[in-house]
């Protein structure tokens, strides 16, 4: 009889525990799936909010060895127009390439340039055996989103991609060609600057010329 009472008590405790589990309130007002979809919608809308596109400052590789590269992107609903300061096999600097993109929720909210295009995928493709090339990404995770700036990191290698909106009167080709003119007009690889009496070394990537001291008052 005593054993029957114990078993009955245990059965009641199990039923009460199960009831509590099913009646537990969600901490959030929305489900995780709803929150993920809301984040996708927010990021998708933000990408399309820049009327003349975004300046994309892209830093490929695992460190500073490649420096940064400038692209411009204008996002539509499912396509993006891209232009780059770089020249590829089929696109001159400043020439526009149109390709597909998508915003999805997987490991966070992601921007994926999954349709092959030279301007993005040139940073991701190896140059040959045991040569990772620029060691870049074509899938990026949103880290912060606003109308003034969007910051993303590469999904595989953690590359940094910073986007800021272009002014309405900016001509894409003139802007990117202007960047290339600055690089062409800088004939030295390393500059020694004196700022407030302190010597600072400024290095320019991919230019192999001797050092020249410059004094800035």
Regions found by a protein language model. Give the residues of each.
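Bacterial N-terminal signal peptides that target proteins for export
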Residues: 1-8
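C-terminal motif of bacterial Sec signal peptides marking the signal peptidase cleavage site
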Residues: 16-19
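Acidic/polar, low-complexity intrinsically disordered N-terminal segments immediately downstream
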Residues: 21-110, 168-193
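Glycine-centered tight beta-turn/hairpin loop motif at sheet-sheet or coil-to-beta transitions
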Residues: 92-94, 156-158, 197
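Nucleic-acid-binding small beta-barrel platforms of the OB/S1 family
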Residues: 106, 113-116, 212
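Beta-sheet ligand-binding and adhesion/scaffold domains
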Residues: 114-185
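Solenoidal tandem-repeat scaffolds enriched in leucines and small polar residues
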Residues: 197-204
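Single conserved hydrophobic/aromatic residue that forms the stacking wall/gate
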Residues: 205-216
């Amino acid at each position: 009889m005593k054993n029957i009472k114990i078993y009955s008590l245990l059965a009641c405790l199990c039923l009460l525990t199960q009831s509590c589990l099913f009646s537990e309130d969600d901490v959030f007002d929305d489900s995780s799936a709803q929150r993920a979809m809301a984040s996708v919608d927010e990021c998708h809308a933000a990408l399309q909010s820049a009327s003349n596109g975004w300046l994309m400052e892209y830093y490929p590789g695992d460190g500073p060895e490649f420096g940064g590269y400038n692209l411009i992107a204008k996002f539509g609903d499912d396509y993006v127009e891209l232009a780059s300061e770089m020249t590829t096999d089929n696109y001159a600097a400043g020439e526009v390439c149109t390709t597909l993109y998508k915003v999805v929720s997987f490991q966070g909210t992601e921007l994926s340039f999954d349709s092959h295009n030279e301007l993005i995928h040139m940073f991701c493709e190896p140059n040959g055996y045991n040569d990772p090339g620029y060691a870049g990404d074509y899938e990026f995770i949103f880290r912060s989103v606003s109308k003034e700036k969007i910051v993303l990191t590469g999904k595989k290698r953690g590359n940094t991609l910073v986007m800021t909106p272009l002014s309405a009167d900016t001509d894409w080709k003139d802007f990117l060609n202007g960047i290339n003119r600055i690089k062409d007009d800088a004939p030295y690889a390393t500059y020694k600057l004196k700022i407030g009496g302190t010597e600072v070394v400024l290095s320019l990537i991919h230019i192999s010329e001797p050092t020249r001291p410059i004094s800035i008052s």
